[in-house]
A protein has these predicted regions:
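Terminal, non-catalytic protein-protein interaction segments that mediate quaternary/complex assembly
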Residues: 1-346
Length: 346
């Protein structure tokens, strides 16, 4: 079982060169990474530092979190921070509601997509659909509440749409599985088990690790569990030849004991509530629009009982409201920072 940097080093020195889509990558098949203490944020100042909101990668991490929490399948918001998204929309007929949409908004799959979104067959048999109409995350939570030792609390990050002709965004993460088990000292841990079919160790895993950690920590917090060890099983672990120089820099840092992964910690809900209210005040200072007052008030009210849902509502508003699309990228960056920091400490 490897750490992030061990995995990267093994790709470099043991990986094979392949050329999917005619692009050279160095790749290892069937690797595993183990993460403890939520150390999922790369902090290598001057080289790659997602903890710094001023770096390109730091800005992308925060924008991606806001976009994920919005549940939006559109690319206009996230394309401001990662241009590749503008090329990944589905190429369906104009009549298809998923035309130009993407399939890899992980927040949609976790917090918005019903657990049985595509099981219309159940409705034909007049079966009770209420339990499976709820989003996957809460379905998994319910399974653990019914049986704390359940092996069924699993989230599916894919859907049948990805198999259609015209799809450019074939979802990488496949599943995220939660199991609660008691350790030898009598404490409970929530095991956060992720399977991903294809993982770019530089441009993908850097941002995926924080997301998976957040989802696992949120589930654990709902059960009063503090420790959330995470295992990531990667079918294709690789990096592109264009990132070779950066890979060499990171490996060299590790040789001098200067490579750092730091912890991303989900705030206590009470702290989150106060910070979400502060974030709303900040957003209102830029958008003193009476048409938005009702939404802002609902976010503040919701933050008292369910701060994560409050964040989802705020992010959904920012990503989808036309007013927010007319402001500068710098303002959006600062809003992203406010929201990210209201949820996490690091």
């Amino acid at each position: 079982m490897w750490s992030y940097i061990q995995n990267l080093s093994n790709i470099k020195f043991c990986g094979l060169v392949t050329n999917p889509r005619g692009i050279e990558v160095r790749e290892l098949i069937g690797t595993n990474i183990w993460i403890n203490d939520n150390k999922v944020l790369m902090k290598c100042p001057g080289i790659r530092d997602v903890t710094n909101p001023q770096t390109k990668e730091g800005q992308y991490l925060r924008a991606e979190f806001v976009w994920y929490m919005s549940g939006s399948l559109k690319t206009d918001f996230i394309s401001m921070f990662g241009k590749m998204w503008s090329r990944l929309g589905n190429k369906f007929s104009e009549q298809n509601i998923y035309n130009e949409k993407i399939n890899s908004n992980y927040g949609y799959h976790v917090f918005y997509k019903p657990a049985a979104e595509n099981l219309t067959l159940l409705e034909e048999f007049d079966l009770d659909m209420e339990n499976v109409k709820i989003p996957q995350f809460y379905w998994a939570k319910n399974e653990l509440e019914k049986d704390r030792n359940s092996r069924k609390a699993i989230l599916q990050y894919t859907w049948p749409l990805i198999y259609l002709p015209g799809v450019n965004d074939f979802t990488c993460t496949q599943t995220q599985h939660f199991m609660i088990r008691e350790t030898y000292d009598g404490l409970e841990e929530l095991y956060n088990l992720v399977n991903i079919r294809s993982s770019d160790a530089i441009k993908g895993l850097t941002f995926d690790l924080p997301w998976w950690s957040f989802v696992g920590q949120y589930m654990a917090k709902l059960f009063g569990i503090e420790n959330t060890p995470m295992k990531v099983s990667i079918n294709s672990s690789h990096y592109y030849s264009t990132d070779e120089a950066l890979v060499d820099q990171l490996i060299q840092l590790n040789k001098s004991n200067s490579f750092r992964m730091t912890s991303l910690i989900l705030r206590e809900f009470s702290d989150m509530t106060l910070r979400i209210r502060s974030a709303v005040r900040f957003v209102k200072s830029y958008f003193n629009d009476k048409d938005l007052y009702g939404i802002f008030d609902k976010v503040k009210l919701l933050s008292e009982s369910d701060p994560i849902s409050a964040v989802m509502l705020l992010c959904n508003t920012i990503v989808n409201e036309e007013r927010f699309k007319r402001v500068s990228r710098d303002v959006i960056c600062e809003i992203n920072n406010q929201i990210f920091d209201s949820v996490f400490k690091y």
